[in-house]
Amino acid sequence: MEGSISNFLSPGDKALCINGGKFGERWGKICKAFGVQVTEIKVEWGDAVDPKAVADALKADPSIKAVYVQASETSTGVSHDVKALGEIVKGYENTILVVDAITALGVFDIKTDAWGLDVVITGSQKALMLPPGMAFVSVSDKAWAFAEKAKNASFYFNFKKERENQAKNQTLFTPTVSLIIGLQEVFRIMKAEGLDKMFARQGQLAHAMREGMKAAGLAIFPKNSPSDALTTVCSPDGVDGQAIYKNLRVQYGITAAGGQDQLKGKVFRLSHMGYADRFDVITAVAATEMVLKGLGHSVKLGSGVGKAQEILMAK
């Protein structure tokens, strides 16, 4: 995230940041650390940004040089429509679109060139199924022109120098060799399944998880445009979301996550990206029902599991 700011903007440049969660908020914080003037579109947590709001902001101030957004906002479980945003930003030759696809790439289709996504970043630790430690970035010709003029200092995250080295089959600094070897296997697995089938599977798993939780009497936090990378579930009244995710781990060996900031105790989050299958979803829904029952919440055991099974059996 830092490199996608320091390599393309200079102190005093203007950026438009979509703040609809913890990681959207982070865009603004990093921009300010590099002396970039930030305009934020604050989106209620659980909502996706309205593309019209972005279009209106750029129309009001065409001097904005970059728009920063998450394709998948991990803190809320919302997916922003980066395809629509790309169409908008294409109309501004002096503005680039930068997309955080850390929990999106490998989950659903992202057409960087066709959609006009100038800079797209991701990491090894999400749908690419590897340990953390390696980041990836794609850069359009339009964005490279910005990099030639940027005046923010960057030593380790210098994309221009990295590009020069990679043209010689080298890296700027010591590479994460073990992760690169692991990435070979990841790509082999993805290629064997086929991207279209992989995206369809991820979508089916996400749909089954959401509908299974609803059938168990729980509400899904995103109001619209839920991400297929994870499901963010609202805790029932009187039940602490932190207790739910902790009991999932302690009692049933399922690693989930709690809410962040104002969502702490109010939601819990379950991932189904990467190497996940139908029975991972069924197990997660079943364990959630059992945890809720154990915490004294009224839930009909098997109600959510049955719904998830119906969806997962569909062709």
Feature-to-residue mapping (PLM):
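Conserved beta-loop-alpha segment that forms the PLP phosphate-binding cup at the N-terminus of a helix
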Residues: M1-L16, G20-G28
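Active-site phosphate-binding strand-loop segment of PLP-dependent enzymes
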Residues: V49-I102, G106
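Conserved active-site segment immediately N-terminal to the catalytic lysine
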Residues: D113-Q125
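Active-site C-terminal subdomain of aminotransferase-like
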Residues: Q125-E211, A215, K315
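Flexible, glycine/charged-enriched surface loops at secondary-structure junctions
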Residues: E193-R201, A215-N224, G259-D261, L295-G306
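PLP-dependent enzyme catalytic core of the Aspartate aminotransferase-like
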Residues: Q262, K266-K315
